[in-house]
Amino acid sequence: MTQRLFVTGLSGFVGKHLQAYLAAAHTPWALLPVPHRYDLLEPDSLGDLWPELPDAVIHLAGQTYVPEAFRDPARTLQINLLGTLNLLQALKARGFSGTFLYISSGDVYGQVAEAALPIHEELIPHPRNPYAVSKLAAESLCLQWGITEGWRVLVARPFNHIGPGQKDSFVIASAARQIARMKQGLQANRLEVGDIDVSRDFLDVQDVLSAYLRLLSHGEAGAVYNVCSGQEQKIRELIELLADIAQVELEIVQDPARMRRAEQRRVRGSHARLHDTTGWKPEITIKQSLRAILSDWESRVREE
């Protein structure tokens, strides 16, 4: 039986992949069309978004760039918290009573001691930047809404996800773009990066999407789920692998302007709860992800 799905943030990195994923995969979900432009900070624009009532909602939209959150924390909180509240209120006014999946972030955990790795959902969050604060606050709001309104509310905490189409403000996309330019003779074989002597838990965007859809079907109401690979990858090694795939020799140079605050040296999450509840597991290898990202950037660079 086909179920109606409404998704915010369809124009973003994950949203675009979700549209393609639903069009190509055999799933019980039919993506509802968006009848007009809307702004989550303008409640009047939300009232008639749903000619057909959705069975489920995935709330992807938000301000996700950490440096921007430091630059304008008020705006980040408005978009990520007040925008979420406006969406919840509009859905309630429309009579929604289905499944609501809020997409938070693994960044809410903050600084985690290496002895506490891998990161489990039971770990108490200690957000260290305004973006993470806004996501944790919105998590609480959504879970409270589920209790008081009787909706089936779930929270996903994705860790770093990667794939074709990501902005080059993210480290792997930035490296892939620069390497693609080197391969085409458009820049010197000198790669400018931020702090790459750290490890992160990277997951392909296709695996992220399959996790979200599994949660819609099988997740437990009121629960929080890490969405991650369960593996840590050193960023420097991934850049070297990108260069190897592209067959490009390069010099790596750290750019102080690209360094971020509130970094920690190692990140590795646990997806045990997600696997135990839904049967989900990652399917795409890191090398497959990097090949797809590099191929995408080679095409985009040719069009620049």
UniProtKB/Swiss-Prot annotation:
Residues the record lists as binding NADP(+): 13-14, 39-40, 131
Function according to Swiss-Prot or TrEMBL: Reductase that catalyzes the conversion of GDP-6-deoxy-D-mannose to GDP-4-dehydro-6-deoxy-D-mannose (GDP-D-rhamnose).
Top-level division of the source organism's lineage: Bacteria
UniProt GO MF annotations: GDP-4-dehydro-6-deoxy-D-mannose reductase activity; NADPH binding; oxidoreductase activity
Record-given protein name: GDP-6-deoxy-D-mannose reductase
Biological processes per GO annotation: GDP-D-rhamnose biosynthetic process; lipopolysaccharide biosynthetic process; O antigen biosynthetic process
EC class: oxidoreductase
EC number(s) recorded for this UniProt protein: 1.1.1.281
Positions that bind substrate: 105-106, 160, 200, 260-263
Reaction it catalyzes: GDP-alpha-D-rhamnose + NAD(+) = GDP-4-dehydro-alpha-D-rhamnose + NADH + H(+); GDP-alpha-D-rhamnose + NADP(+) = GDP-4-dehydro-alpha-D-rhamnose + NADPH + H(+)
TM spans (from-to): none
Family: Belongs to the NAD(P)-dependent epimerase/dehydratase family. GDP-6-deoxy-D-mannose reductase subfamily.
Keywords: NAD, NADP, Oxidoreductase
InterPro entries: Epimerase_deHydtase, NAD(P)-bd_dom_sf
Keyword NAD in record: yes
Pfam families, sorted: Epimerase
